[in-house]
């Protein structure tokens, strides 16, 4: 597939519960997020997408939105905050909120569909559900996938020996890839929405 070279300038925000969970150690959180983004880049290479961590913001004093166990409400608040505050402060294409709260209904992440480059909706919410960076990378790559137009694969989807990243639930495994269906969804998103913000070089 001839997918264009795209660049996602990503901001990750770690909430106050994350700060407390990691004993107020900024370096631990930083290292973790960098490793997560490294995995995301490995997954997205097949789609010709480069993800760069433009900024990592850690809410060390307090949360700037109300983080609650309702994923829907928290995602909505985060989108509003991104549009009104974060976008004015730093140019970026997408923001992901990393929270240590336990989300309702066994939710590990939530994101808007077809929303990359949208001022309010180019966001995702990720629960810090596993100490394993690979699995966190899969979760964030999955939510970013929704932002890029990808719907869920079947629950048993495999690509060769790898588990498909857009499976509805997270199955622990050793290797993960985007399915052909995910690539087609992304191509369709590019054709329909023409997301200018990821087509420019950072």
Curated annotation (Swiss-Prot):
It is found in: Secreted. Ca(2+) binds at residues 9, 93, 197, 200. Disulfide bonds join 117-197, 157-164. Residues 6-202 form the Peptidase M12B domain. Signal peptide: none annotated. Binds 1 zinc ion per subunit. Its cofactor is Zn(2+). This protein is a zinc protease from snake venom that induces hemorrhage. This is Snake venom metalloproteinase HT-2. The lineage of its organism: Eukaryota, Metazoa, Chordata, Craniata, Vertebrata.
């Amino acid at each position: 597939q001839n997918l264009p070279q795209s660049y996602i300038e990503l901001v990750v925000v770690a909430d106050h519960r994350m700060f407390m969970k990691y004993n107020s150690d900024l370096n631990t959180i930083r290292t973790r997020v960098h490793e997560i983004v490294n995995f995301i880049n490995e997954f997205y290479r097949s789609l010709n997408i480069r993800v760069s961590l433009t900024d990592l913001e850690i809410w060390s004093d307090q949360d700037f939105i109300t983080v609650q166990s309702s994923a829907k409400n928290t995602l909505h608040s985060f989108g509003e905050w991104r549009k009104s505050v974060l976008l004015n402060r730093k140019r970026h294409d997408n923001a992901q909120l990393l929270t240590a709260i336990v989300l309702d209904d066994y939710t590990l992440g939530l994101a808007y569909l077809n929303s990359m480059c949208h001022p309010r909706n180019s966001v995702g919410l990720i629960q810090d559900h596993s100490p394993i960076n690979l699995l966190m990378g899969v979760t964030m790559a999955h939510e970013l996938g929704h932002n890029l137009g990808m719907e869920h694969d079947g629950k048993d989807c495999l690509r060769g020996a790898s588990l498909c990243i857009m499976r509805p639930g997270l199955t622990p495994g050793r290797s993960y890839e985007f399915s052909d269906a995910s690539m087609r969804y992304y191509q369709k998103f590019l054709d329909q929405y023409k997301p200018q913000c990821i087509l420019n070089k950072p």
